[in-house]
Amino acid sequence: MMWNWMASALALGVTLVLYDGHPLHPEATVLWDMARDERVTVFGTSARYLALLEKAGADVAATHALPALRAICSTGSPLAPESYDYVATRVKPGVRLSSISGGTDIVSCFALGNPALPVRRGALQCLGLGMAVEVWDDAGHSVVGEAGELVCTRPFPSMP
């Protein structure tokens, strides 16, 4: 999926910044060094990386000026509510933080960020366009305001 996003970005004239290596080596802030130096505007990462960065005690906000950074997108697993707090206090206060859900198998996002909506701690902001998605409990019933499985209930326009 990231390949498709990168190809689309390149077609629009965007400059991509990629890192090849361990995201916490040689030090926990190596990706933020790169983001600062390259004036990254949108930083894509994983929920696990943000949790590990917090565990390492990195105070990015205190050590890195990131004036170009407008948004951080997190994927790979649900972003813990504590990670929202960490980004808001120790990475870049006021940055748009979007937890997204989708994947390689669908080449799309079921849910993603939206700059017109507020960011809520521990929540996905909105469904992707054309996505019929519900949360189901263990019995296979649609639930609202409860934890469960994210289920796509109908085909969607960009379905592979």
Task: Describe the predicted segments one by one.
Residues 19-21, 74-75, 136-138, 153:
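Thr-Gly-centered strand-to-loop micro-motif
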Residues 126-128, 141-160:
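Conserved ATP/PPi-binding loop(s) of AMP-dependent carboxylate-activating enzymes
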Residues 6, 11-14, 40-45, 54-121, ...:
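Gly/Ser/Thr-rich phosphate-binding loop
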Residues 1, 27, 106-112, 144:
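Active-site-proximal flexible loops/turns
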